[in-house]
Amino acid sequence: MRGRMSIGTWALVAAAMAAPTLVVAQSNAPVVAVLYFDNNSFGKDRADYDGLGKGIADLLITDMAGNPAMRVVERDRLQSILQEQDLVKSKSIDPQTAVKLGKLLGAAYLVTGGFMSDGKGTLLVTSRVISVETGAITNPLKLQSKGDDVLGLIGQLSTKLNTELKLPALPRQTGDAGARKSGAATSSSSARQAGAETTKSQKLDVKTALLYSKALDEQDSGHPKQAAELYRAVLQKFPDFGPARQNLAKVQSSGD
């Protein structure tokens, strides 16, 4: 999608930046947002993988949340901004729009990327980092899965980003406001890191990753019952899969 995105008032920007959407406790660490990955697959089965980019982003957020050198924007907040800006159905977001989106999210850096599937379980993932302030693109990466293992591929990508992405710290906040932000982030981070530890010990095939991505879509669309059914289907295959377990609990509490 190459359409223009209108930016709201400064009040909207300020509200977005102030929202408690960060998942790492260090208040002076730079804020990073992971956007949904583009489906760059081709062939007659291309459309079958359209939802996978959301699942890849969600799992990458979970994995990167354990890095104390950055604060990562929650996927729920990203989805909310995409809905506000009428970008939910966009197949891809151009760099200029991505920068504007980053400002609304209060992020200093964006991780964007795409994936290609060969239809047999092997994925090729590319990613890059965009500076919201300058629009500069850095840290281009290209990785291929070792067999039908989406989590292994995301783990590789997360490790490379965490290792190679050298982000300067922001001025440290002081006073009660900083303490309140830090406390809220610590509590959210604990849950995310628990999920990240679980994902590293398992393999997740493309078919199940697509199922998980569809569950996220149903959850975002306000269909908790359908989302719960899909999360249960994922957990039937992978009982210890933390992200699915956490999201199932969330949709159950909202009306399953």
What kind of feature is each model-predicted range?
Residues 22-24, 100-101:
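Short, flexible, glycine/charge-rich loop motifs used to bind or transfer phosphoryl groups or to couple energy/partner
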Residues 73, 110, 170, 243-244:
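Secondary-structure boundary/capping residues
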Residues 24-71, 78, 83, 181-256:
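A structural "domain/chain start" motif
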Residues 69, 75, 140-142:
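Residue-level detector of high-confidence beta-strand sites
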